[in-house]
A protein has these predicted regions:
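Acidic, surface-exposed loops and disordered segments
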Residues: 1-185
Length: 185
């Protein structure tokens, strides 16, 4: 898949959980590196202020978002609590205007998908390496993806960015657009 035209799976990259999760430092290396960097401006990092100011935005400025801010948003997703610390989710970053337009249509013509940064959070129960029935693993994966998305939205707010949660979409169409068999959450 050409990354210029299609979505790019950006998390996890090069990290696969093991049966036993003994080395938490492996997961935290990316986060630690990102936290060392700083965007051109930090807006607010007081958690309660961030939570109280976060709102759904339905109109976005057509401005490029700094890569370091996107990295911090993705790193925030990685800090969300997950079942067994296995991160049962994957994130797709949709950059292409054509793919964004297709997502608008897959999301019942909600125009908010034209935001400068579009992240699609998908559940991946195969990453949850627990000896439990499949329906429980699927439940854990959707919880993991949902928490990761929520943490990402809080990080975006802390960095002075707006966001919106889009929950009404055609799963099959979104899966085809981002070229995955994983179900978006």
């Amino acid at each position: 898949m050409d990354s210029k035209d299609g979505p790019e799976k950006i998390y996890p990259s090069g990290y696969e959980p093991k049966e036993t999760n003994t080395d938490v430092n492996v997961r935290n290396q990316l986060l630690n590196e990102i936290l060392k960097s700083s965007p051109t401006e930090f807006i607010n990092t007081d958690l309660f202020t961030v939570m109280s100011k976060r709102r759904s935005t339905r109109k976005f400025a057509d401005k490029i978002v700094e890569t370091v801010k996107i990295d911090k948003i993705i790193a925030a997703a990685d800090t969300a609590p997950t079942a067994g610390n296995f991160q049962g989710f994957e994130i797709f970053y949709v950059k292409s205007p054509e793919k964004k337009q297709q997502l608008v249509e897959a999301c019942n013509n909600q125009p908010y998908v034209h935001a400068p940064v579009v992240l699609v959070f998908c559940k991946n129960p195969a990453r949850v390496k627990l000896d439990l029935p499949e329906e429980i693993l699927k439940k854990f994966a959707i919880q993991d993806a949902t928490l990761a998305a929520a943490y990402s939205q809080l990080a975006a707010q802390a960095l002075g960015l707006s966001s919106i949660w889009i929950g009404m979409f055609d799963e099959q169409k979104v899966m085809k657009i981002i070229n995955t068999d994983l179900i978006p959450s």
